[in-house]
Design a protein with these regions (language model features):
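Extracellular glycan-interacting surfaces
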Residues: 1-282
Length: 282
């Protein structure tokens, strides 16, 4: 509140916070902010910058149950990349060859049933990944990669990368049907805890793959806009009892078929995330 007009500090742009469930002796947490990944061991009373530098705008951080940290920093900053750390202090940039040099926000999806597997869905990967035409004459590039940790620091031969970008929904009947993260505004990737091949990605619409996006033939749209929506008054509609622009997806721990979907319209519930067509409750 005391910042001069036109200025800001890193806490004005705090993208997300995660807690370390493996640290039983300290109140350890991580925060993705403008330009930095911060770490605290006293419940947020004080913070240290562990990653960053420059003007990396879109940053993210997630953590496994045993304290392995994954962080992403967009390409505007000197600390750009996809990073892995076993302790939050020593970091390794594991970004794969062929990822591209320009990229924006990245969503991170850790596989709960095998936390060595992590999906990275990245918006605005200029001239790299899947190209899609979007509504109102727009266009975008999006990348989807799956990483598997093998050994050591997880880099080079100690990590395996698979580029799944070609299977992001594109070339659909209308531009409303194509994947569209709108510059990273609406972006998510989640893995079903009890079925590791069931992967959800979200942009304007919400999609479910039953083969981990290893193909484009086992993917269905389960939310967002109605399929076939198009420009013009009366030519578009929203999925029944759901809403476009996806931001998060949560699985009920006691029943992984029950999900909560957060988007621009609010929070929606489904009691069977494998159903097609999908039935939502608002």
């Amino acid at each position: 509140d005391n910042n001069p007009a036109g200025s800001f500090n890193v806490f004005d742009f705090a993208w997300n916070i995660v807690l370390d469930p493996s640290n039983l002796n300290e109140d350890e947490m991580y925060m993705a902010t403008y330009g930095s990944i911060l770490r605290s061991v006293d419940g947020g009373e004080s913070w240290l910058e562990e990653l960053g530098g420059g003007n990396a705008y879109y940053n993210n951080v997630e953590i496994t149950t045993d304290g392995i940290v994954y962080a992403t920093l967009s390409s505007e900053g000197t600390g750009k990349g996809i990073w892995r750390s076993a302790d939050g202090m020593e970091w390794t940039n594991i970004i794969p060859d062929g990822f591209g040099n320009v990229y924006g926000r990245t969503a991170i999806g850790i596989n709960p049933s095998n936390e060595n597997e992590v999906y990275f869905l990245t918006a605005e990967t200029e001239n790299s990944g899947q190209y899609t035409n979007t509504f109102f004459g727009g266009e975008t590039w999006t990348s989807l990669w799956k990483y598997t940790y093998l050994c050591g620091d997880g880099n080079d031969s100690c990590g395996n990368w698979i580029n799944l970008s070609a299977n992001i929904p594109a070339n659909r009947p209308t531009t409303f049907d194509n994947f569209n993260a709108q510059g990273g505004y609406d972006l998510l990737v989640k893995v079903k805890p009890d079925e590791p091949n069931v992967v959800f990605i979200g942009g304007t619409n919400l999609w479910r793959s039953t083969d981990g996006f290893t193909s484009d033939s086992n993917t269905v749209q389960i939310g967002g806009y109605v399929e076939g929506s198009d420009h013009g008054y009366g030519n578009w509609d929203i999925y029944s009892k759901h809403h476009p622009l996806q931001h998060d997806l949560l699985f009920l721990p006691s029943d992984n078929n029950i999900i909560l979907s957060a988007n621009d319209g609010g929070v929606y519930k489904s009691t069977n995330c494998m159903a097609s067509p999908h039935l939502w409750y608002s």
